[in-house]
Curated annotation (Swiss-Prot):
Optimum pH is 8.5. Belongs to the peptidase U40 family. GO terms for biological process: killing of cells of another organism; symbiont entry into host; symbiont entry into host cell via disruption of host cell envelope; symbiont entry into host cell via disruption of host cell wall peptidoglycan. Signal peptide: none annotated. GO terms for cellular component: virion component. This is Peptidoglycan hydrolase gp5. The lineage of its organism: Viruses, Riboviria, Orthornavirae, Duplornaviricota, Vidaverviricetes.
Amino acid sequence: MSKDSAFAVQYSLRALGQKVRADGVVGSETRAALDALPENQKKAIVELQALLPKAQSVGNNRVRFTTAEVDSAVARISQKIGVPASYYQFLIPIENFVVAGGFETTVSGSFRGLGQFNRQTWDRLRRLGRNLPAFEEGSAQLNASLYAIGFLYLENKRAYEASFKGRVFTHEIAYLYHNQGAPAAEQYLTSGRLVYPKQSEAAVAAVAAARNQHVKESWA
């Protein structure tokens, strides 16, 4: 338990009349006071402690999702809309901050959420009839972000297969389209010139692999 979480537990205990030191260390005194509470109060304090890291992240313009939360939502949503779960597992670590036990993503600025969408792309998906919340709200939500990633995957798959008939839409190529947008992605696949070159090392490696796969298949 972090020091901030320990303080939250201890001050909650004191507010409930328990005599504990607020020192940011959960020792035998704090645990005994917690055990002495009725179950409903104990549960409320435990839930507060668990939610504190996420609340702190939001205050810092980031939100944190645990690996278990992401994996559970991906399994459900990928099956529902027909997008490979493995694609989500490929994309999310590239687009977000990998932290102990999960992922942190930005919820302010031009690019937001697990898919790092900008407003233009998000709103285009909504105009295409995809059932998504407004950009500010949806990009901070786990489920909405995952649906948006999947919906964009399906749109980009259609675009790729229309332009390059018979080619395999790999995860790397799907990520290239997600990262660059369909017109810029097609230009990169044919010319090798990246329209938006300012990317993380992981993103650059993924889009380079996409072009290598595309070119290799054209020689087959």
